Amino acid sequence: MKTVSLLIDMKQKQTKISMVTAYDFPSAKQVEAAGIDMILVGDSLGMTVLGYESTVQVTLADMIHHGRAVRRGAPNTFVVVDMPIGAVGISMTQDLNHALKLYQETNANAIKAEGAHITPFIEKATAIGIPVVAHLGLTPQSVGVMGYKLQGATKEAAEQLILDAKNVEQAGAVALVLEAIPNDLAEEISKHLTIPVIGIGAGKGTDGQVLVYHDMLNYGVEHKAKFVKQFADFSVGVDGLKQYDQEVKSGAFPSEEYTYKKKIMNEVNNND
């Protein structure tokens, strides 16, 4: 199983880190089989697999349920599970209880929490043995306030992001996700941190990249961000479903090839 020290070693050797956001047993199993370094169980599962309008409806129970499934599918991959909205920021005692519950019940390698304001939480969680991945730039749980737009696009905002990144590292974060920020800013932050920096919509200057399984494979998604490249097309599965429907209605399925051949009704009738 990959560890924090191995990920740091990859950064030091300038070996790029691959990360995929996945939400269930079969997708996690595929991700591990592909040799991907890390899996993120993101609260984006709310929209992607649960049909919610946003991440706001995602609960701690949702994250635990899906985190467990992913761990079962990828026992040897570094798994990070999101703290959902409301799980951090109530009180330090409650925050740590939520973090411990998520970490223990999913058997994850780390949890992830969003925003620059969580540095005290990172310090406390680290102190009790919970590895935390920080998330700066565009933070999906805050899109109601900041909107879906490029972050760090002004001199002041860029300087603040650099400071925030240094602060979360100093607080004890084991890695950092940077989302939707300028390429040169992400590269600068990556150079100045000793922990791995994983980018999504942050250019190629980071230590690694993360994309959502469903986005990169075109699986049930209607809108994809500018930074998403499609690596396969799972939407062709709809064609298979249509063919199945046609064959059931026409009687073509199941044919003899898919039917058990043993004759039993003669025996049943002879007993009458």
Swiss-Prot record:
Residues forming the catalytic site: 179
GO molecular function: 3-methyl-2-oxobutanoate hydroxymethyltransferase activity; magnesium ion binding
GO biological process: pantothenate biosynthetic process
Disulfide bridge partners, by residue number: none
InterPro entries per record: Pantoate_hydroxy_MeTrfase (IPR003700), Pyrv/PenolPyrv_kinase-like_dom (IPR015813), Pyrv_kinase-like_dom_sf (IPR040442)
Gene3D superfamilies: Phosphoenolpyruvate-binding domains
Catalytic activity as recorded in UniProt: 3-methyl-2-oxobutanoate + (6R)-5,10-methylene-5,6,7,8-tetrahydrofolate + H2O = 2-dehydropantoate + (6S)-5,6,7,8-tetrahydrofolate
Binding note for cofactor: Binds 1 Mg(2+) ion per subunit.
Residues the record lists as binding Mg(2+): 43, 82, 114
GO cellular component term of the entry, any: cytoplasm
Pathway stated in the Swiss-Prot or TrEMBL entry: Cofactor biosynthesis; (R)-pantothenate biosynthesis; (R)-pantoate from 3-methyl-2-oxobutanoate: step 1/2
Annotated CDD domains: KPHMT-like (cd06557)
Main location: cytoplasm
Cofactor(s) listed: Mg(2+)
Subunit text: Homodecamer; pentamer of dimers.
Family in the record: Belongs to the PanB family.
Described purpose of this protein according to its UniProt entry: Catalyzes the reversible reaction in which hydroxymethyl group from 5,10-methylenetetrahydrofolate is transferred onto alpha-ketoisovalerate to form ketopantoate.
Record's protein name: 3-methyl-2-oxobutanoate hydroxymethyltransferase
Originating organism: Staphylococcus aureus (strain Mu3 / ATCC 700698)
